[in-house]
Design a protein with these regions (language model features):
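Conserved donor NDP-sugar-binding/catalytic core segment of glycosyltransferases
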Residues: 28-66, 70-73
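A short, conserved beta-strand element in the Rossmann-like catalytic core
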Residues: 1, 28-30, 56, 123, ...
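Short beta-strand-to-loop acidic/aromatic patch adjacent to the donor-nucleotide binding site
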Residues: 17-29
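Active-site-adjacent helix/loop segment of glycosyltransferases
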Residues: 136-186
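Short, flexible, basic/aromatic active-site loop/helix in glycosyltransferases
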Residues: 72-98
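Glycine-rich, basic loop-to-helix element that forms the pyrophosphate-binding segment
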Residues: 1-15
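A short, conserved alpha-helix in the catalytic core of glycosyltransferases
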Residues: 98-149
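Short glycine/serine/threonine-enriched helix-capping/active-site loop
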Residues: 23, 50-54, 81, 145-146, ...
């Protein structure tokens, strides 16, 4: 389980409060300078709480998998910006985004602890969106840093359209909206 495993890893490592944590999937390939570009937004904006890279498909490095994210509590949708589109200049600007994908995100240890880690009630899927919503409720920014680039071999663990993946995704989304949507939005 993503949430519990990452939480246990942080507890085991016991990093210093000022250290940065990078949570990254095992089916990714990073560029040589991705970490510098992932840290830079923290250095220039004290309201930055989480950063995320531009994520391209490993099988087609010209196509976007993630260039930021959008959450709509009214429609119950969680969308990656740019998904399956060819990379273009419009995906190359530093910007605030609604959520950070757990495929790769960076956060300061003290902030991760203030957020009380990943919520382990999410088995797989939406624990990253939940963390992002809680971060935004602290009036902090999640920043998409497009100069930080990684490649993602999508769904290598579960299969892109497997029943298990779809079931886990829907279960995570239901838990997420039940936890965060207002009575009018449900």
């Amino acid at each position: 389980k993503y949430a519990g495993g990452n939480n246990a890893g942080v507890e085991y490592l016991d990093p210093k409060q000022e250290d940065f944590l990078v949570f990254i999937n095992n089916d990714t390939i990073v560029s040589s300078d991705f970490l510098n570009h992932l840290i830079n937004p923290f250095l220039s904006d004290p309201n930055c709480i989480i950063t995320v890279p531009k994520i391209l498909y490993a099988m087609d490095i010209n196509k976007i998998w993630y260039a930021g994210g959008l959450i709509n509590m009214w429609t119950g949708t969680i969308d990656h910006i740019g998904i399956r589109n060819y990379d273009a200049p419009r995906y190359s600007f530093l910007m605030e985004t609604d959520y950070a994908t757990g495929c790769c995100l960076c956060i300061n240890t003290s902030d991760f602890k203030k957020l009380n880690y990943f919520d382990t009630n999410f088995n797989m899927y939406c624990e990253d969106v939940d963390l992002s919503i809680r971060a935004k409720k602290m009036n902090r920014k999640i920043v998409y840093s497009p100069k930080s680039i990684i490649l993602h071999s999508v769904s290598q663990s579960l299969g892109e359209n497997s029943f298990i993946k779809i079931k886990n995704k829907l279960t995570g989304q239901m838990k997420l909206f039940w936890k965060h949507a207002s009575g009018l939005q449900i």
